[in-house]
């Protein structure tokens, strides 16, 4: 499950995945649309539902940014 947000100059992605050990991870990536600079952060979540809840929290945070990010892609 990958969600992607964009502003005029920046992008942000959050991906919910299961690793080889069965752990659920939320991988966040961000960077500039016109640069090669980026960052990443991985959080381990207890289960699928906690991961989905974290995606919705991230969506709320992206909406509160000034200027706000727009959800461009939501794949399940």
Segments from the language model and where they lie:
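Short aromatic-glycine-(Arg/Gly/Cys) micro-motifs in beta-strand/loop hairpins
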Residues: 15-42, 56, 65-68, 72-74
């Amino acid at each position: 499950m990958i969600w992607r947000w964009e502003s005029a100059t920046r992008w942000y992605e959050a991906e919910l995945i299961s690793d080889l050990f069965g752990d659920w991870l939320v991988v966040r990536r961000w960077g500039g649309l016109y640069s090669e600079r980026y960052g990443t952060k991985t959080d381990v979540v207890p289960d699928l539902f906690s991961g989905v809840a974290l995606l919705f929290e991230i969506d709320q945070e992206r909406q509160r940014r000034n200027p706000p990010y727009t959800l461009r892609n939501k794949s399940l």
